[in-house]
Structures are given as C-alpha cells and as structure tokens.
C-alpha cells in the first residue's frame, strides 16, 4: 500500500507540467471578438487554476450550448456529468424559480417544510435509512470520511486517532486537502503537503490488494468509484464490486461508493453499483442531483453509521436548504419520468459501437458504460488538438490525462441527435 505521507518527487510534477504546456496550444479567437473579450477578462481577474477550451458560452438548452457569437455546440462533457437531465430542464427550472420566490435558505438552525420531504424522498428512492445533505461532491466525500472514522471509533472500537481509510489509486473526488491527500496524481497533490494521515492507496480493480489491506484491524472504510471517471472512464472487471461488498462485510469495514459522477442514470442504471446488484454502506451523490442548476450533494447510509454523528459534529450552512431540496427532487423526478437511465444505456451502446469503427491508429481504445465513455487517442495526434478541432466542428469535449477524451453528453440525447454528433466525431478524427 502507498501512504500519502511518504516522500514524493518533484521530477514527476515538472515532467507533467512540461508535457501539459507543450500539448495545450490554444486556437486564438478572432482579434477583437466578443469571445476574446471574455477570455481576457477571466484571465485578468480570475485565478489561473483552469485551462478551459477556448469557447465562451452564454446559453444552454437540452444537449446544446451556444457561445457568445451564437454558434451552437453539442455538449459532450455535461459539466462533468452534472447536466444529465440536459441544460435548463424546464421542470427543474420551474421548481427552482417557484421555491426561490418563497424561501431559499434557513440554515439548519431551524426546520423547513421542504427538507423532511426531500429526505424521505431520497432515502426511499435509494434504499437507506438516513441522508446527510451537503452542497458539493467533495463535501460529500469529506462527510463520508468523517462518518467512517466516527463509526470506526464508536462501533469498531479502533484506538483513538488510528483509523485508516483505503482508497484506489487514480481516484478523484475533489480538490480539498483531504481529497488531494487521497490522490496519487502530481497535478493534484504537489505543493500542498503535509497530507492527511490515515489515508492509504491500493491498486484499483485488484481484489488481492483489497483483501490484504482490509486485514488491518484499524481500517474503517474503503472508498471507491464504481467507474473511475476523471482517470478516463476506467471500468473495472465484472464482479469487482461484488468482491468489494463481500470483503468489506467479512472484515467489518464500511464500503463507501463514490457515485458523484457515475450515479443518477449516467452509466445506464440509476446507480453504477446496480450493475452488480450490491449496496454500499455509504453512498455519495452530487453533480446531477440538481440537474446542473444548483450545488446539491448527499451522503446516504443506515442508522448504525449515520447516528454516530451528533449535533454540532458536522454541518453546512447551505446543506439541506429549501431551494436545493426542491431542485433535487425535481431533478430526480426527471430521471425517472423520462427514463433517462434506459436511454443512457441504449444510446451508450450505439455510441460505443460507432466509435469502435474509427481507425485504430488514431483511436486505440473505446470504453465506457451508458453515456459515460472515453476514447484513447494515439499520442502523435494530441488529444487537446483533437478537442480544438471538435470545437470547430460543433462539439465540445475535453481531454484528460493527456491522451484520453471523455464523451458524456446529457442523457436526454436521442437517436437522431446522437447520430448527428457521432458524424462530427468521425469527421474530426478522420481529418487528423
């Protein structure tokens, strides 16, 4: 196992930055254009912690977004799977505007007439006793880790300050100090130490490594993504999640499923863990929980875990606010009413089938589930340049880890639009 407190070399980081800088050339917009003005203002007044594709968006509807010059694009990123229901879904917008005009925020110092309704709805939908409402995915991850540690001390009787949480290498769950402490990606952790103690890493999709790690009596939890999204849509072997469930139960260890990106119909099931018919001890949801209209996340588990947390030990000013709760219920209703999991499954099969016909000397790998997919580009073609060309042709996607391009359109995309977007991808790849 690899601990985040071990020494890490700077050489990896330098090599990473050099490679990134060399590959990320930006196609300049027309001089004096409105887009150029937008880029310049952000560059002047904003932190330089992102390297966006050079497009300035001003409108979204369904599977499309428009830039400030009025050009329309297919959105094949979906805000990292936050916009599963499509941009500005009318039902979710209606829920937001109606609740915003009544009551938006109370804090948890008082009850509201919406929170309990939401809590009942979401716990019954996913089959848990309790939910702890938060705002962002990374807050959900932090909450899950706190719950696991608290349970470890109170229920498993781990000695004070000795609890360990195991993570899979190449995970991604955010940018807080806890999240980067669980990362082995230099671009996430370099320069931010010292790191969180009690976090250890094992290989993803490696049952033997997990079995060995869980023998440690001080391990309280194993946190893992059912599919590693940010890594480039890495799908584990069939049966991996069943073994995770089996080993965690055998060793009295909590299984935390990070479904912030994979959950809520994205992979063709309501949850990605549903493919193996298993339930985690702690479930983290976020992103599409609000349909992209408001930051909402949730941590679900049963009473023996959730009731370890007492008043004053965890909370959030905005978590569980009436506006977020109303939006989340509408977003979840859309997933079910429009059968978006079923659509994601069917459209994903078609998308991967068509992508698999692309020349292997350009696209070496096609992988994914539902509408969470990725292609691996031969290094000599440069994935960043491919994305710039896709943009020119009317489709927005973003590379990850150098040679991987994620394809994850909103789940409302139907056959004709999907085929139209596939033609853009084919045209682009064949022109490289």
Swiss-Prot record:
One of its GO terms (biological process) is arginine catabolic process to glutamate. The modification N6-(pyridoxal phosphate)lysine is found at residue 287. It holds the Pfam family Aminotran_3. It comes from the Eukaryota. Belongs to the class-III pyridoxal-phosphate-dependent aminotransferase family. GO terms for cellular component: mitochondrial matrix. PROSITE patterns: AA_TRANSFER_CLASS_3. Disulfide bonds: none annotated. The keyword Transferase applies. GO terms for molecular function: identical protein binding; ornithine aminotransferase activity; pyridoxal phosphate binding. Its cofactor is pyridoxal 5'-phosphate. This is Ornithine aminotransferase, mitochondrial. Its EC number is 2.6.1.13. It comes from Drosophila ananassae. It catalyses: a 2-oxocarboxylate + L-ornithine = L-glutamate 5-semialdehyde + an L-alpha-amino acid. Pathway: Amino-acid biosynthesis; L-proline biosynthesis; L-glutamate 5-semialdehyde from L-ornithine: step 1/1. Its main location: mitochondrion. Keywords: Aminotransferase, Mitochondrion, Pyridoxal phosphate, Transferase, Transit peptide.
């Amino acid at each position: 196992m690899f601990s985040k407190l071990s020494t890490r070399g700077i050489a990896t980081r330098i090599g990473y930055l050099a490679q990134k800088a060399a590959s990320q050339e930006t196609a300049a917009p027309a001089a004096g254009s409105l887009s150029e003005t937008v880029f310049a203002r952000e560059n002047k007044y904003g932190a330089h912690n992102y390297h966006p594709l050079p497009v300035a968006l001003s409108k979204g509807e369904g599977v499309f977004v428009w830039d400030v010059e009025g050009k329309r694009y297919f959105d094949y990123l979906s805000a990292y799977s936050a916009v599963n229901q499509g941009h500005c879904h009318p039902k979710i917008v209606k829920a937001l505007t109606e609740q915003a005009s009544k009551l938006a925020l109370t804090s948890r110092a008082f009850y509201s007439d919406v929170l309990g309704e939401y809590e009942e709805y979401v716990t019954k939908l996913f089959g848990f006793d309790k939910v702890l409402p938060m705002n962002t995915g990374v807050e959900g991850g932090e909450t899950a880790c706190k719950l696991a540690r608290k349970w470890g001390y109170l229920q498993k009787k781990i000695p004070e300050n000795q609890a360990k949480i195991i993570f899979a290498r190449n995970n991604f769950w955010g940018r807080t100090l806890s999240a980067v402490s669980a990362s082995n990606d230099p671009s996430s952790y370099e320069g931010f130490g010292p790191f969180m103690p009690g976090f250890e890493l094992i290989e993803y999709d490696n049952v033997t490594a997990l079995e060995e790690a869980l023998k440690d009596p001080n391990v309280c939890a194993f946190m893992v993504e059912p599919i590693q999204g940010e890594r480039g849509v890495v799908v584990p072997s069939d049966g991996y999640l069943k073994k995770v469930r089996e080993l965690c139960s055998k060793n009295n260890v909590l299984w935390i499923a990070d479904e912030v990106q994979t959950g809520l119909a994205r992979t063709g099931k309501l949850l990605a863990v549903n493919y193996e018919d298993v339930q985690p001890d702690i479930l983290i949801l976020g992103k599409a929980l609000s349909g992209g209209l408001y930051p909402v996340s949730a941590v679900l588990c049963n009473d023996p875990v959730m009731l370890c947390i007492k008043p004053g030990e965890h909370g959030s000013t905005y978590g569980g606010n009436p506006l977020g709760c109303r939006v989340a219920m509408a977003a979840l209703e859309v997933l079910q009413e429009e059968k978006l999991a079923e659509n994601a499954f069917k459209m994903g099969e078609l998308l991967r089938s068509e992508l698999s016909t692309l020349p292997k000397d350009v696209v070496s790998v096609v992988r994914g589930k539902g509408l969470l997919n990725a292609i691996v580009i031969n290094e000599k073609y440069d994935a960043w340049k491919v994305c710039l060309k896709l943009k020119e042709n009317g489709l927005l996607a973003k590379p990850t880890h150098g040679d991987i391009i994620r394809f994850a359109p909103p789940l409302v995309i139907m056959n004709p639009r999907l085929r139209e977007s596939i033609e853009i991808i084919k045209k682009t790849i064949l022109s490289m």
